[in-house]
Structures are given as C-alpha cells and as structure tokens.
C-alpha cells in the first residue's frame, strides 16, 4: 500500500507538471483579448473552432472571421487595437507583446491603431504587404479596390515589386491581385468616412 500511494503521489506530481507547462506554453501563445463582438465572429485554432465571445483570448496561429453585418474589436497585447468589419478574415501568424508581429488579412476591412513605442507589425494580404510602425490605418476593400489609408503616422506598401510610402492623410490603391500600388494621394472625405465606418 505504501508503494502504491507513492506511485499515485508521483503520478500526481507528473500531471501537475504537465498542467503547469501547458499553462505556461498557452500564456506564451496569447496574442490578445476580445473587447467587442457584434453579430457572428468565429475563431479557428489548433484545438478549437467556435463562436468568439467578449473577453475571450485569441492565440497566435488563430484564424478569426466575421460574418455578414458583424464586427470585432480586440487588443493585440496591451496597447495595439485591431478592428475588423464584416466578412473579414485574418490569421495571427506571429505576435509578441511590444515586439510586433505578422497578420494575414485574407478578406474584408481592418483598422489597426498601434502606438509608436511598440514593435513593427506586417499585414500580409493577397494584394501586397503593409509594414506598420506607430500608426493608425485602414486596410481593405474601398471603392472597388484594395485600399490602404493612413489616419496618422506612415506606412510602406509593397506589391508586384513596387514599394510606396504612405504618409498621414494619404492613401494608396491596389486595383487587383498582382497590380502595383498607386502613387499615394489624398482620399476624399466621403471615402475616408465610408472606410472607417466599415470597421467601427
């Protein structure tokens, strides 16, 4: 009985160790937390596929999608705000708190608001690459094209071998997959309003 009790005790310690290691590993993979959900928002990850709820955690490697007439607001880390409009789909490829990361934007509109004191974030899409530092910007469908508009700060946009720098108050368009970004230009007030309304 003494030996049996000792084996049970050791097995319990081993399981506890696994649980602690699992908890630490999961904490290392945390990308952010959900602040707002309107309509249907789903998350698909390594071990889950479900509707995403308020205050839930989103992990590195998760794919998050919004349905029709649906929107999402979440924080990446503590300071970077991410908003998705309807019919959007992103995958958080890599993210370290205050060190930046990579997001795949596969569909729909996205708004990113990132302080200057956090690391750079890359937004990859089928249309091109947007490199973000301390910036608030819109990325996604606008006036029938893929648009990038900088509310404040500056970004670089690379597509089809061409890179442009987009300054505050300017935007660039990519007409289709495989096309180059246009020379940055000021967007009209109505276009800006519609773009920002799609993610707020």
What are these regions (language model features)?
Residues 1-21:
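N-terminal secretory signal peptides and thylakoid transit peptides that target proteins
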Residues 23-63, 67-200:
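Flexible, surface-exposed loop/linker segments and immediately adjacent secondary-structure boundaries
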């Amino acid at each position: 009985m003494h030996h049996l009790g000792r084996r049970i005790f050791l097995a319990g310690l081993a399981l506890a160790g696994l649980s602690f290691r699992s908890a630490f590993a999961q904490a290392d993979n945390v990308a952010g937390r959900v602040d707002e959900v309107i309509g249907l928002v789903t998350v698909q990850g390594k071990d889950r596929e479900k509707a995403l709820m308020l205050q839930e955690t989103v992990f590195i490697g998760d794919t998050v999608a919004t349905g029709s007439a649906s929107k999402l607001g979440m924080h990446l880390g503590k300071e970077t705000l991410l908003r998705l409009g309807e019919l959007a789909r992103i995958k958080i490829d890599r993210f370290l708190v205050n060190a930046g990361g990579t997001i795949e934007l596969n569909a729909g509109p996205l708004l990113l608001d990132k302080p200057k004191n956090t690391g750079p974030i890359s937004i990859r899409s089928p249309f091109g690459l947007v490199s973000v530092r301390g910036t608030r910007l819109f990325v996604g469908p606008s006036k029938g094209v893929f648009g990038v508009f900088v509310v404040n700060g500056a970004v670089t946009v690379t597509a089809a071998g061409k890179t442009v720098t987009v300054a505050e108050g300017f935007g660039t368009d990519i007409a289709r997959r495989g096309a180059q970004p246009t020379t940055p230009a000021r967007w009209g007030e109505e276009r800006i309003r519609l773009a920002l309304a799609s993610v707020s």
